[in-house]
Amino acid sequence: MRKNILITGASTGLGEGMAREWAAKGCNLALCARRADKLEALQRELQQANPNIRVLVRGLDVCDYDQVFEVFRAFRDELGSLDRVVVNA
C-alpha cells in the first residue's frame, strides 16, 4: 500500500529534499510551506518525474496554530489517511 507523507517546510532545503526522496520511493505527498509558488513548482516537478503518485500542496504558516490543524485535516481528508508527518518548518 502506498504511504501518505505530510511534510511542513517543504518548499526548500531539507523539506524539499525529503519530498524528492519519498516521491522517488512511490509515496504520496502532502506538502506545505509559506511559499506556495515554490510548492507548486515542486509539485509539477515531482508529478512529472513520478506520475503514479499524488502530490498535494497548500500554503501554511506554522505560526498560525489553528491553520496547522485545518491544513493537516484537509490533507488527511483528501488522501484518506496520513502515515507520517514530518515537522520540518
Task: Label every model-predicted segment.
Residues 83-84:
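Conserved catalytic-site loops of classical short-chain dehydrogenases/reductases
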Residues 59-70:
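The beta1-alpha1 cofactor-binding region of Rossmann-like NAD(H)/NADP(H)-dependent oxidoreductases
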Residues 55-57:
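Hydrophobic/aromatic anchor residues within beta-strands of the central parallel beta-sheet
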Residues 88-89:
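Conserved NAD(P)H cofactor-binding loop of Rossmann-fold oxidoreductase domains
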Residues 22:
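Aromatic pocket-lining residues of Rossmann-like dinucleotide-binding sites
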Residues 9-13:
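Conserved glycine-rich cofactor-binding loop
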